[in-house]
Amino acid sequence: YIFDNDRWGRRFQAALARAAQRGVKVRVLIDDVGARYSLPSIVGKLQRSGVETARFMRSWKPWRFRYYNLRSHRKIMVVDGQTGFTGGMNIRASHVLADRPAHPVQDLHFQVDGPVVAELQRAFASDWLFTTGEELAGPDWFPELHPLGLAVARGIADGPDENFDKLRKVLLGALSCARRSVSFASPYFLPDQDLMTALKIAVLRGVNIEIIQSQKCNLKMVEWASKPGLEELARSGCRIVQTPPPFDHTKVMVVDDSWVLLGSGNWDPRSLDLNFEFNVEVYDRELALEVNELLNHKKARGTALQPGAGNGFPQLRHLRNSVFRLFSPYL
């Protein structure tokens, strides 16, 4: 989604250029809006260095404004058709906490191996064909892949080009199947009524629901709009844990210590209805326990949102939050 023209973006650009010079087939697809998070965009530098680069859904021409909200939020990298990377991380300096950036962002990204890598590649190839007209096919892009372990995984490519709401149905299905526990982190939390109801019903069935959120969101209007829903869920028995800075951009969900959902999707209208997203569901107890350990570390640093009238906020803030909640489909 985002590929910034900063120190780390330029390091990626240089590495990609060296790969292209070695004869590696390199294709880079950046969302048109995501490419403009830093100006000048890094697209020109990539193209001038010999890296085949394209912008997804260019929407700045007046006759294309109606497509402005349809963004590719996917974060996919595939190497030699055999090793994949996906999760929540963009290419920008703010993700490198060791450099002490001015606006640090904590995130979680995964390396993926085995047959599921072909599903990452298919999602990219489909977007590349749509954008450029070039078809990526053959063993260079899709080599034969063999199982490497016991985990069962499936890629979930979702977007507004389909009538079947895959991400929403996966989330609803996971909540309905949960028997003991559900833990998840989502930086932007604006679930629709179906998901709100599913969370409440899971609590009534005795499922322990824990939601991890940053105390301060990098998008203020989203933070305000999310507060009424979080307080409503806290009153219904969900445990809401708010973590201190840095801002946590992690997107991951664990159910019953056996199922993990990872990828780019948030619990908000953009991910559920407007964006092109890519997630991976994994049935693997070892991975689930590892992710839960990370989530437990986050929870240990945070504080629980206490349910109750006002939750200590002045009434004017409640009015502001409720008003912004009305606009959540547009945030």
Residue ranges and their predicted role:
Residues 1-331:
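Charged, low-complexity intrinsically disordered terminal segments
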